[in-house]
Amino acid sequence: MVMTNILCQILSDDLPELPPCREPSKGMIVGNLGMTSNTMTTEGPFAKLDVESVLSFMSPSCTLRSFPSSLGKPALQTKEESKADFQGLKDFFYNFQLRVKDGAEPVIDEPARKVVLHIEGKGDSLVGRFETEYVYILQINEEGTMVEDFFQFADSATRDAWGKKIEAHFSARN
């Protein structure tokens, strides 16, 4: 039931497959992310690019796995190693917002404590608007308050195209 409450903080309360939501507890994952309904608010840590807050929903031993390998990121990072990646976003983005993609229902396996989400990300950057998609697979701790393992599969074509724009931007400045 705890995972359902976490997801109710992400998703609208009118999803028929979920039991009615209880009042979220203070330490729940999505509350830490600044999510309401099915979107992370403009006041949330992703929008503000507040690195400590973004990582606050990960347990101290959380691992982050990023795919596809063509992105050139290490296949496995610790929470501490992930900090530099998130910090680097502040150099390029003015804001960044994540939301569950319209029409994409989450996959929730409470006994296994796993959640699968299809996410869309949008933000304003040095080189214009950035829009992308991710699939997140989250392994949640027994209390339902922290992510123990964070698997993300990113849209590599969009990221590559945006990376080329960033390179061109900095080349033009030099």
UniProtKB/Swiss-Prot annotation:
It comes from Emericella nidulans (strain FGSC A4 / ATCC 38163 / CBS 112.46 / NRRL 194 / M139). Homodimer. The gene is ausH. Pathway: Secondary metabolite biosynthesis; terpenoid biosynthesis. Part of the gene cluster B that mediates the biosynthesis of austinol and dehydroaustinol, two fungal meroterpenoids. The first step of the pathway is the synthesis of 3,5-dimethylorsellinic acid by the polyketide synthase ausA. 3,5-dimethylorsellinic acid is then prenylated by the polyprenyl transferase ausN. Further epoxidation by the FAD-dependent monooxygenase ausM and cyclization by the probable terpene cyclase ausL lead to the formation of protoaustinoid A. InterPro entries: Fungal_Meroterpenoid_Isomerase (IPR050977). PANTHER family: AUSTINOID BIOSYNTHESIS CLUSTERS PROTEIN F-RELATED, AUSTINOL SYNTHESIS PROTEIN F-RELATED. This is Austinoid biosynthesis clusters protein H. Disruption phenotype: Impairs the synthesis of austinol and dehydroaustinol and accumulates (5'R)-isoaustinone. In A.calidoustus, the austinoid gene cluster lies on a contiguous DNA region, while clusters from E.nidulans and P.brasilianum are split in their respective genomes. Genetic rearrangements provoked variability among the clusters and E.nidulans produces the least number of austionoid derivatives with the end products austinol and dehydroaustinol, while P.brasilianum can produce until acetoxydehydroaustin, and A.calidoustus produces the highest number of identified derivatives. One of its GO terms (biological process) is terpenoid biosynthetic process. Belongs to the trt14 isomerase family. The lineage of its organism: Eukaryota, Fungi, Dikarya, Ascomycota, Pezizomycotina.
